[in-house]
Amino acid sequence: MDYNELIKQAEELQGELEEIRHDLHQHPELEFDMEYTKPYIKTKLEQMGYEVEEVGKAGLVTTISGNKPGKTILLRADMDALPIREEADVEFKSLCEGKMHACGHDMHATMLLGAAKLLKVHQDEIEGTIKLEFQPAEEVFKGSEDMIKAGLLENPKVDAAIMFHVVAGVPMPTGMIMVPGGGVSMTSCEQYHITVTGKSGHGSMPNLSIDSITAAAQIHLALQEINSREIAPGEY
């Protein structure tokens, strides 16, 4: 596979992919509600010649194998939006009030569709198998778990997974790719709850009560200091 030829073929898809991205951007959907997005992407893949499997509550998976043995690599793109009202004045502005693609998942899904098209062109050159995953509910941290439980990483068993995420508002030129070391491709977060129980008291004797608001504020400040003072930038 000649790199320059591959880039040329990718550039030739730009107009088509821009139309797809604008269409997806106009129809943002939340969490597992993929009534427009899922069939839209499924149809695009089927038009390329892929057999598409619905995995989990709203996910899509398809595979492509070459004529040479090799490992199975998963390429993953998320496709859900956020409950945010879009104020940008663009032709492809969200048509769904209170919803918008504010995190670039419309672009992620579009790029994976573009990759799927190029992989079909170069299928004979693929060593092993490439599995393509379109994941819902990334913003609520539920989509990946749902698809994994439904067998995403099996049949064939996945050896490694690759995801990508666009970024804005940083001093980087368009087209640059950042790859952190240590096998970690993207930072994430975890959710947890802390319950602070107070104790009521009379206004004349506050020393006998427990001020839960002040205690919670101190906890919040202490947790923030861990990130800003105890962990070096770039560490996880």
Where are the regions a protein language model picked out?
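Acidic/His- and Gly-rich active-site-bordering loop/insert found
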Residues: D2-H101, T110-E127
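Histidine/acidic-residue-rich, glycine-tolerant segments that coordinate divalent metal ions
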Residues: L82, V90-M100, M107, D124-Y236
